[in-house]
């Protein structure tokens, strides 16, 4: 993302992958400008600074650009992107405190991995049921203590698999 709350595709940034840009009621546009900021790198930028200062917000949504999400580039490119970010996240104080969950998901219609990384997850845990974006939304809402939106009451949260 080239600038906070960018509303136009630019280079490898696709606005369609950024949910914050679709909220337009009330103070949403101001909140988008304030809180929807470029990721940066594992070494510098908004997320790296928050990790260094141990001031992560309650919710962080990260979507890679069109190359690092492997839509337009080889899977190995996305693997390298994750290989730089995941260690940075799990070595952070926020993660070590046990309050952070990392979800790695894809937006493809075919069966895809759904990866959950958290200090509370027992290594080797496998979820035997189908997980979709509604289950992720339900889980996120439950973890944040938010009311359930739309169709999420009809899905199962995966919080028991998170050890919570």
Predicted regions and their residues:
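N-terminal pro-sequences and low-complexity stem/linker regions of secreted or lumenal proteins
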Residues: 1-164
